[in-house]
Amino acid sequence: MTILSGTTAAPRVNGTTMNGHSKPHTNGVHLNGHAPKATTESPWPQSEEKTLLDKFVEAYYEFESYKSGQTVKVDGKTLSLAGVVAAARHHAKISLDDSASIKDKVVKSRKVIADKVASGASVYGLSTGFGGSADTRTDQPLSLGHALLQHQHVGVLPSSSQPLDVLPLSDPMSATSMPEAWVRAAMLIRMNSLIRGHSGVRWELIEKIAEIFDANITPVVPLRSSISASGDLSPLSYIAGTVVGNPSIRVFDGPAAFGAREMVPSAKALASHGIDPLPLASKEPLGILNGTAFSAAVGALALNEAVHFAMLAQVCTAMGTEALVGTRLSFEPFIHATCRPHPGQIEAARNIYNLLEGTTFASVHHEEVHIAEDQGTLRQDRYPLRTSPQFLGPQLEDILHAYVSVTQECNSTTDNPLIDGETGEIHHGGNFQAMAVTNAMEKTRLALHHIGKLLFAQCTELVNPAMNNGLPPSLAATDPSLNYHTKGIDIATAAYVSELGYLANPVSTHIQSAEMHNQAVNSLALISARATVNSLDVLSLLISSYLYILCQALDLRALQMEFVKGVEEIIREELSLLFASVVSPAELEALTSKVLSAAQTSLDTSGSMDAPARMKKMASTTTIPLFDFLTELTLPDAISSGIAMVSIPSFRSHLASRATALLDQLRRDYLSGQRGAAPASPYLNKTRMVYEFVRLTLGVKMHGSENYARFAKGLGVEDETIGQNISRIHEAIRDGKMQAITVAMFA
């Protein structure tokens, strides 16, 4: 708390201190740009393990290298989640590692299978039935492969892409088939598994899948039907069906367009690209199907987004601390690195602490005051800000563990049986059981809910005038009787976080015995990954809504900084004009302090009033301190006393009218753009990047110009809807543009 005149706590108006003797500053950084020399020694401990932030930044720069032309290498051991995203969603080129050591493993494992077939040995998947029917025998391995694909092509898909006679309850394609990005990611991951040389397939098969992938031919794969037990059998069968050119298997082909591309039979698509179908040899149908590629694919794509959202949550928390004029002290190293050194908690605290470096709005030091000086004042921030490292930290740890686990899954052999090409041994196991992915997705989805819950709590505090340290109700930039700006967002975010809570429920507790009780336990990994994508969809809505609110709140804080300074100047001018002739300079300063305190108290409790009535009320509250102060003074004569008393009504009138005019002028200047498109920028430091990205790059303006004009031109003529502005932020989050900004903030 800033001290006025050495002894008296300076009043605050709308969460901002009225103190004309000094410029606002924090962390030793003044608005005039001068700052003390920075120390090079970090107060935070150095970790030998990579943090989630490390993974996030590394993945971003790796992803950028793929966008610049570097190929995603398929070698069975180095495929990253960034590589999966780049190839699946952004059409980065892939390259098979055809080095002698890699190809030799594939060739050797294939020779083991060929030798077993030639010798007539009984081997699972070569001469036996599948799963619970493994007690059957056949000496026709090629027909056995056809039978495998046939019984797995059970997905329910639209029979036509033509318009329907009856409007559907839900979109026929999205309700039944996977997005192309999921399928492309699965193709890539399956190639990466097969190239490890443990599945007994030919090199030509891996090349054929790569050729189809490069041609941007994407199988139409059913959204449902996998329990991720013996791998994602049915979804992967559609990739196998495309490889062989099954005319009943359809694919997406043709130029990209808004919405789905053209659906055509796989044989037609292959022919149009000059690609010959590849008949599958013995064991190869099983080699394609028996794996976790779809679970790992959707999990990888989901985690890429989840890591970004976890970083954005910390950015939002830093901005929320500024918008609520909170304190950086909640994130001090002593609290987290010394007293409770959980890795995730330390990471979250360090990141938020660093983001608040150089802030103007948040306090950076603690000043002790006497009990009498801070009656009714919170000595610490509320839980959503103060305990955010403790709340976010475990989520960062869980997402990091999931990230590592799914990365490992993308570089594993998930097949059965497994072939050791060096010894000729065939191993029967269960690497297709995708519980590693399930656990990763369950903890990620729960973490996403907790992140959403924290941001929702911050958001509701920010729009509530009883908790937001002097901001107007619903962050209305104009008179609140005709401006309910964020009320709809407040309701919407409650819907979002409620849905996140529902989605956070575990999927794996619903496992059912399947396939003649052979798959008595299964992972449901793909279902869990799909649910996690749904959570990401919802959380992205909440984050974009909160970012929109944060930018509005920061603009209002900037406006109030000017308003507070102006009100103080008005009070000083009017008091000097009316009372300087009857009181001493020291007495005038003491009187000014009491009047400022009364003005602050009034403004902090009258935010729901329109400006004229609010300023009139503020002015009226100065009567008692003025009267009490003047009656306690020993004035030189009755004339002086009379002058002082009759001047009180004039002071009130002038203060109310001038403060009303000042607030109106500031509102007009801010909403019309006269203060610039990003008026809060001078008050921000590291968080300025995301604020200016929203305001300048995305063109999301401060809200309230329609309200200021009393809707003279109607709705939507001068301003887009609130939802349209939030949609711009949402699109930037989902298409990767915001990710670049987030990385730059932490770099």
Curated annotation (Swiss-Prot):
<feature type="cross-link" description="5-imidazolinone (Ala-Gly)">
    <location>
        <begin position="229"/>
        <end position="231"/>
    </location>
</feature>
<feature type="binding site">
    <location>
        <position position="290"/>
    </location>
    <ligand>
        <name>(E)-cinnamate</name>
    </ligand>
</feature>
<feature type="active site" description="Proton donor/acceptor">
    <location>
        <position position="124"/>
    </location>
</feature>
<keyword id="KW-0585">Phenylalanine catabolism</keyword>
<dbReference type="InterPro" id="IPR008948">
    <property type="entry name" value="L-Aspartase-like"/>
</dbReference>
<feature type="binding site">
    <location>
        <position position="380"/>
    </location>
    <ligand>
        <name>(E)-cinnamate</name>
    </ligand>
</feature>
<keyword id="KW-0456">Lyase</keyword>
<dbReference type="InterPro" id="IPR022313">
    <property type="entry name" value="Phe/His_NH3-lyase_AS"/>
</dbReference>
<comment type="similarity">
    <text>Belongs to the PAL/histidase family.</text>
</comment>
<comment type="function">
    <text>Catalyzes the non-oxidative deamination of L-phenylalanine to form trans-cinnamic acid and a free ammonium ion. Facilitates the commitment step in phenylpropanoid pathways that produce secondary metabolites such as lignins, coumarins and flavonoids.</text>
</comment>
<feature type="region of interest" description="Disordered">
    <location>
        <begin position="1"/>
        <end position="47"/>
    </location>
</feature>
<dbReference type="GO" id="GO:0045548">
    <property type="term" value="F:phenylalanine ammonia-lyase activity"/>
</dbReference>
<dbReference type="Pfam" id="PF00221">
    <property type="entry name" value="Lyase_aromatic"/>
</dbReference>
<dbReference type="GO" id="GO:0006559">
    <property type="term" value="P:L-phenylalanine catabolic process"/>
</dbReference>
<keyword id="KW-0587">Phenylpropanoid metabolism</keyword>
<feature type="binding site">
    <location>
        <position position="416"/>
    </location>
    <ligand>
        <name>(E)-cinnamate</name>
    </ligand>
</feature>
<dbReference type="InterPro" id="IPR023144">
    <property type="entry name" value="Phe_NH3-lyase_shielding_dom_sf"/>
</dbReference>
<dbReference type="InterPro" id="IPR005922">
    <property type="entry name" value="Phe_NH3-lyase"/>
</dbReference>
<feature type="binding site">
    <location>
        <position position="518"/>
    </location>
    <ligand>
        <name>(E)-cinnamate</name>
    </ligand>
</feature>
<keyword id="KW-0963">Cytoplasm</keyword>
<feature type="compositionally biased region" description="Polar residues">
    <location>
        <begin position="1"/>
        <end position="20"/>
    </location>
</feature>
<dbReference type="GO" id="GO:0009800">
    <property type="term" value="P:cinnamic acid biosynthetic process"/>
</dbReference>
<dbReference type="InterPro" id="IPR024083">
    <property type="entry name" value="Fumarase/histidase_N"/>
</dbReference>
<protein>
    <recommendedName>
        <fullName>Phenylalanine ammonia-lyase 2</fullName>
        <ecNumber>4.3.1.24</ecNumber>
    </recommendedName>
</protein>
<dbReference type="InterPro" id="IPR001106">
    <property type="entry name" value="Aromatic_Lyase"/>
</dbReference>
<feature type="binding site">
    <location>
        <position position="487"/>
    </location>
    <ligand>
        <name>(E)-cinnamate</name>
    </ligand>
</feature>
<feature type="binding site">
    <location>
        <position position="515"/>
    </location>
    <ligand>
        <name>(E)-cinnamate</name>
    </ligand>
</feature>
<comment type="pathway">
    <text>Phenylpropanoid metabolism; trans-cinnamate biosynthesis; trans-cinnamate from L-phenylalanine: step 1/1.</text>
</comment>
<dbReference type="GO" id="GO:0005737">
    <property type="term" value="C:cytoplasm"/>
</dbReference>
<comment type="subunit">
    <text>Homotetramer.</text>
</comment>
<feature type="binding site">
    <location>
        <position position="386"/>
    </location>
    <ligand>
        <name>(E)-cinnamate</name>
    </ligand>
</feature>
<feature type="modified residue" description="2,3-didehydroalanine (Ser)">
    <location>
        <position position="230"/>
    </location>
</feature>
